[in-house]
Amino acid sequence: MGTDSRAAKALLARARTLHLQTGNLLNWGRLRKKCPSTHSEELHDCIQKTLNEWSSQINPDLVREFPDVLECTVSHAVEKINPDEREEMKVSAKLFIVESNSSSSTRSAVDMACSVLGVAQLDSVIIASPPIEDGVNLSLEHLQPYWEELENLVQSKKIVAIGTSDLDKTQLEQLYQWAQVKPNSNQVNLASCCVMPPDLTAFAKQFDIQLLTHNDPKELLSEASFQEALQESIPDIQAHEWVPLWLLRYSVIVKSRGIIKSKGYILQAKRRGS
């Protein structure tokens, strides 16, 4: 094991929380040697390479301090939005909750995304369906704690618009009727339905909800896949001790031209028992 791995292993053995951010993937250059075939493959690659890059540049002072929170990033890829250009950009995010016991993850993720990008608010946040036990159908009760956090963030002007993912007509209608801040969009996975369901289309049209498509897997990041990436990047680490809480994928689009200026991932993980 090299010095880099030893330092990273020592820090991760003492830290309680890990914040990992890829920076703008369009700035990765040599780090992006291949074009991943799926979102899961891209994410695994990003986590692994971010950890590798971070561990190769650890400041010796950090090892003496042993901070509770580790900020793991690809420093040369970090890119904040120029305040003078903010009005020309649309900043969108999709939030994936991995650890279902933490509704406060929503606020943590949005706050961190704003900080990373240097903005006061996000234009749009879509929340993926929270994790539920196998054999259990998603209900309004599963969504409510996360949606309430999103509503608070809209009311405090941290987010402009909020949306959902993979809700059928009944689920979307229940959320719409209950929510104070209504969903303005719902993503549909075309892998599971080649044509938009007519009842969902009719309901969305009636209440001015935009129907979007996506091709994310049901579970973009699992505890096992995160631990695998951690183990591959930093050998001999106690990877099973680390649990991802949430993952946020963002994109910054130039409104007038419809081109992506920036995209990346941010995630938070905690060590068990901390």
Swiss-Prot record:
Pathway: Sulfur metabolism; glutathione biosynthesis; glutathione from L-cysteine and L-glutamate: step 1/2. Pfam families: Aldo_ket_red. This is Glutamate--cysteine ligase regulatory subunit. InterPro entries: Gclm, NADP_OxRdtase_dom, NADP_OxRdtase_dom_sf. In all tissues examined. Highest levels in skeletal muscle. It comes from Homo sapiens. The modification N6-acetyllysine is found at residue 263. The keyword Acetylation applies. GO terms for molecular function: glutamate-cysteine ligase activity; glutamate-cysteine ligase catalytic subunit binding; glutamate-cysteine ligase regulator activity; protein-containing complex binding. One of its GO terms (biological process) is regulation of mitochondrial depolarization. Coiled coil: none annotated. The keyword Membrane does not apply. One of its GO terms (cellular component) is cytosol. Belongs to the aldo/keto reductase family. Glutamate--cysteine ligase light chain subfamily. Signal peptide: none annotated. Gene3D superfamilies: NADP-dependent oxidoreductase domain. SUPFAM superfamilies: NAD(P)-linked oxidoreductase (SSF51430). Keywords: Acetylation, Glutathione biosynthesis. The gene is GCLM. Heterodimer of a catalytic heavy chain and a regulatory light chain.
